[in-house]
Amino acid sequence: MAKVAHDRGHDVVLWGTWLDDPMLDPVERGEEHPRLRLRLPGLRLARAGDLARALEGAELVVCGVNSDGIVEVLRRAAPSLPDVPIVSVTKGLLEGSAKRAERIDLVVGETLGRDPRFVHAAGPAKAMEVARGVLTWMCFAGRDAESAKAALGGGHLLVSTTDDIAGAELCSALKNAYATGLGMWDGFVGAEAHNARAACFAQAIAEMRALVVAAGGRADTVHGPAGVGDLHVTAAAGRNRAFGERIGRGEPAVEVARDMGAKGQLTEGYAAIASAHRFARERGVADLPLLGAIHAVVWAGADVGATLRDLRFG
């Protein structure tokens, strides 16, 4: 998103957390970003200790910190954070003050002690493709969504807006859990089982819709880029799918998680399965056979073959 903003003509400061020096060092030397494999000329860089300087004069803040770190980063930023929209690409659920699984925007509001003017950026948007100018359709959700769209949308980045921040955030959080399950299904039945994959995908969307509506979101949000679009691209390739595929082929989930974690590849889907299951339980949404099966295999040690063979829905 930093490259998108720069390409739109904005003056951009790219700030890195205390974990991001290996990413910033080559960029500062004029070399390629290690993950994007692109040079990022024209960006001003700021290190972890320069957060206040990075925020000075900002008219828009884009937050790409993962769900484990977003609260701590915004807590540190709070004294210097201007009253401007915060566009978040962070996906997940967090524990709120009521000790329940909650949306990120609600927990961020508690952390900052004020309305954070939060805009959630949802939809299928793989970072490398966005940075390389590949056509991408995103959904910005929140009361400042239009101003965020004006700043970042255009060209290859198509942006629709909605006030349904509950629906958009939940789609983003839930899709990692269901993408892991779809990968698990593919690993179990094989790559040529197209009927089974389609059935599982349709059920995932139905369950996401039930959870979104139960939490006050709208069904139509699930049927757009935030839900169907993001689940499709996440389930097609990537670490969440790979995590599920290995489990589907018979590897114990705990061993796959340990192996991928040791390689720095542990997916958000692992924690997302637990938080999605908790979110559903706390809100009394019970008829979720696919999520129940995914959780049973990944977190309760259920046999993947028996669980998936017994799975029924429709």
How should these model regions be labeled?
Residues M1-L38, R44-G49, A78, V107:
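NAD(P)+-binding Rossmann beta1-loop-alpha1 motif at the extreme N-terminus of oxidoreductases
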Residues H6, G153, R281:
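Anion (oxyanion) recognition and catalysis
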Residues P22, D68, K99, R103, ...:
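Conserved active-site and cofactor/substrate-binding residues in soluble primary-metabolism enzymes
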Residues G42-R44, A48-L135, R143, A148-A150:
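Rossmann-like NAD(P)(H) cofactor-binding subdomain of soluble oxidoreductases
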Residues S88, R117-A122, V159-D163, H223, ...:
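General beta-strand structural signal in soluble alpha/beta enzymes
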Residues E110-R117, L135-T221:
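Internal alpha-helical scaffold of NAD(P)-dependent oxidoreductase catalytic cores
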Residues L182-D186, V213-G314:
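NAD(P)-dependent Rossmann-like dehydrogenase/reductase catalytic/cofactor-binding core
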